[in-house]
């Protein structure tokens, strides 16, 4: 099985990939490492490297070609491609996007002691730089490949990493990947997400306010029912997405009950 994993900066991709490697026996192919090494060799930041790649395609071509070649030559191996665009270049894969709130992403990179990313003096600086890097990458992918990187419909699984442990997320990823593999045994791979597109967000990402005592009492029965849920609800909630924020269109009571019951995830549909 081939899994391609990408997502927001600070979403924990590397940590989750390491768990999938250690616990489930996947081999990691990280093109992000190649990009960081190129930036270090040129004595520039990752952001500057991304900006340079807007005008010099040889770096992108090198990464893209290597990714496609490895996937073709190792179809029978369990490989995770930790790469921004591997979902586009690997012909047959379970495509994952890790989502995380900008505030939590900024906190994570501020506290990152691995020495692989730039250091930030304040949380605001981290937020601003993460937003700038995301905008630069988004523009580059649109200009060079005509791809909308942040379009969730590109992926088979979009999963929120804001509130849950990497171990929990890795477990759900493997469950969904196995389900995908079972379905695809009866299908032929085509371009796109193969008609499989699940978006899982934490209830706290959808509603992070305190539920009033009176309302919590009214939701008691639903909360007790939801306490039995181990991974995600079997109901899909319609939401509107605007940048980093989500607004629940219908099903707000279910979201509040899920938050009170500490349900890990809610499936959502973007309207």
Regions flagged by a language model, labelled:
Residues 16, 20:
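Hydrophobic positions on the alpha1 helix immediately C-terminal to the Walker A/P-loop
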Residues 118-169, 190-198:
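Small-molecule kinase domains that catalyze NTP-dependent phosphoryl transfer to phosphate-bearing small molecules
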Residues 5:
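Hydrophobic anchor at the beta1->P-loop junction of P-loop NTPases
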Residues 8:
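P-loop (Walker A) phosphate-binding loop of NTP-binding proteins
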Residues 92-116, 120-129:
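Conserved phosphate-donor/acceptor-positioning beta-strand/loop module used by diverse small-molecule
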Residues 13:
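Conserved lysine of the Walker
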Residues 31-90, 103-104, 115, 128, ...:
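ATP-dependent small-molecule kinase phosphotransfer cores
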Residues 180-271:
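Short, charged/polar connector segments at secondary-structure boundaries
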């Amino acid at each position: 099985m081939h899994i391609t994993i990408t997502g927001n900066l600070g979403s924990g991709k590397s940590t989750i990939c390491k768990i999938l490697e250690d616990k489930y026996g996947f081999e990691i192919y990280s093109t992000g490492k190649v990009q960081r090494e190129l930036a270090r060799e040129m004595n520039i930041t990752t952001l500057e490297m991304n900006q340079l790649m807007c005008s010099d395609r040889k770096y992108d071509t090198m990464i893209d070609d290597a990714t496609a070649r490895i996937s073709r030559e190792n179809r029978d191996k369990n490989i995770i491609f930790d790469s921004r665009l591997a979902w586009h270049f690997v012909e047959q894969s379970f495509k994952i996007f890790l989502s995380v709130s900008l505030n939590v992403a900024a906190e994570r990179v501020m506290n990152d002691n691995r020495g692989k990313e730039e250091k930030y003096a304040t949380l605001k600086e981290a937020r601003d730089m993460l937003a700038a890097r995301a905008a630069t990458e988004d523009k580059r992918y649109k200009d060079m490949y005509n791809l909308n990187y942040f379009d969730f419909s590109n992926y088979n699984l979009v999963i929120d990493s804001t509130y849950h442990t990497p171990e929990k997320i890795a477990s759900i990823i493997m469950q969904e990947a196995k389900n995908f593999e079972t379905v695809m045994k009866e299908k032929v791979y085509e371009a796109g997400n193969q008609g499989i597109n699940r978006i899982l967000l934490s209830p706290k990402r959808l509603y992070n306010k305190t539920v009033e005592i009176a309302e919590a009492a009214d939701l008691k029965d639903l909360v007790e029912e939801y306490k039995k849920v181990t991974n995600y609800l079997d109901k899909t909630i319609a939401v509107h997405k605007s940048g980093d924020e989500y607004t629940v269109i219908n099903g707000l009571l279910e979201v509040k009950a899920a938050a009170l019951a500490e349900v890990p995830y809610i499936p959502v549909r973007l309207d």
